[in-house]
């Protein structure tokens, strides 16, 4: 959800973003004009992401206002909607765009990437929203992976299976950004039941049709400042229900991206603690904890233990 791998944190929670409390009883159709509006929006966003990467000042959204960094540096998580209208109504759908930032003390960029690229343990890091995740292919600059996340609504036994491509860019020694986009998104009806059925892409409820995210990181002040920017395309909301559904969507959007970022920070700290316990005389830093075998399983067990307390 930062949207790429790091973004996946946000991507995952965006599965809970649309109509969590309401089950609309009919399917939604993804229209060509809806997809065109989405493609245009993402093209503009991609251009802005690339422009930010060239800036010495202005790379991070956080630095645009001094109070943001002060709040984040003091342990807060800042979450804000992007754009004048959020969600943005387009023909046949809605575009949801949010950004969030958090400071992870005593960490390096590689420590964060060790979590956000560890897809096999997403179900531990980001539960209960993630049912499963796995790597399709992996390289220094690009990952392909799949995530199945569940709709936590008690009114609907549904799941979404998404395939993603993330691209990674290092900017010197202390900056990094990544982008992530869905290559396919399929709804799974009757999730976990004997009659479970995977629908074709763009069929079903239309809770989530497309996802795009960006993650930006900078090492400073003894830690990592992590930003996640997440964008989702969903079905439109019938006019008769907007008065009730719109506030729910905005509230859940804010809570979801905030939880994603906090889950990532928690997983990073658990990883560092586990590495230190395993290697008490080693100076941990710059991601070198990941060089020790077994740390993924160890930190997954640590997270499971923390959740059970």
What are these regions (language model features)?
Residues 1, 22-30:
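Charged, low-complexity surface segments at secondary-structure and domain boundaries
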Residues 1-10:
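N-terminal secretory signal peptides that target proteins for export/translocation
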Residues 5-6, 22, 291, 297:
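Compositionally biased regions
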Residues 5-6, 17, 41:
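Generic hydrophobic-segment detector
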Residues 8, 24-25, 308:
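Intrinsic disorder/low-complexity segments in short proteins, especially the signal peptide
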Residues 11-23:
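Bacterial N-terminal signal peptides
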Residues 28-309:
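Eukaryotic helix-grip
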């Amino acid at each position: 959800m930062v949207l790429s791998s790091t973004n996946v944190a946000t991507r995952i929670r965006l599965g809970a973003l649309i109509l969590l409390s309401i089950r609309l009883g009919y399917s939604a159709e993804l229209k060509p004009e809806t997809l065109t509006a989405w493609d245009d929006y993402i093209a503009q966003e991609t251009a802005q992401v690339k422009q930010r990467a060239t800036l010495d000042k202005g790379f991070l959204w956080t630095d645009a206002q001094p109070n943001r960094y002060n709040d984040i540096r003091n342990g807060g998580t800042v979450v804000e909607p992007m754009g004048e209208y959020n969600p943005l109504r387009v023909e046949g759908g809605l575009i949801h765009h949010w950004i969030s930032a958090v400071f992870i003390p005593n960490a390096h960029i590689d420590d964060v990437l060790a979590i956000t690229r560890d897809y096999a343990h997403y179900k531990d890091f980001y539960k209960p929203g993630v049912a499963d995740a796995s790597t399709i292919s992996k390289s220094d600059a690009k990952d392909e992976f799949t995530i199945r996340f569940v709709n936590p609504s008690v009114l609907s036994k549904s799941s979404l299976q998404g395939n993603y491509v993330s691209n990674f860019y290092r900017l010197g020694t202390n900056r990094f950004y990544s982008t992530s986009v869905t290559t396919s998104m399929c709804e799974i009806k009757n999730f976990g039941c004997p009659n479970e059925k995977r629908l074709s892409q763009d069929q079903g409820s239309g809770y989530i049709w497309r996802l795009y995210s960006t993650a930006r990181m900078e090492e400073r002040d003894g830690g990592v400042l992590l930003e996640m920017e997440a964008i989702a395309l969903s079905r439109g909301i019938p006019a008769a229900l907007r008065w009730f559904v719109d506030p729910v969507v905005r509230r859940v959007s804010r809570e979801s991206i905030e939880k994603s970022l906090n889950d990532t920070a928690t997983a990073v700290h658990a990883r560092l603690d586990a590495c230190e316990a395993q290697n008490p005389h080693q100076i941990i830093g710059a991601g070198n904890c990941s060089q020790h075998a077994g740390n993924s399983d160890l930190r997954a067990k640590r997270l499971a233990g923390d959740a059970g307390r």
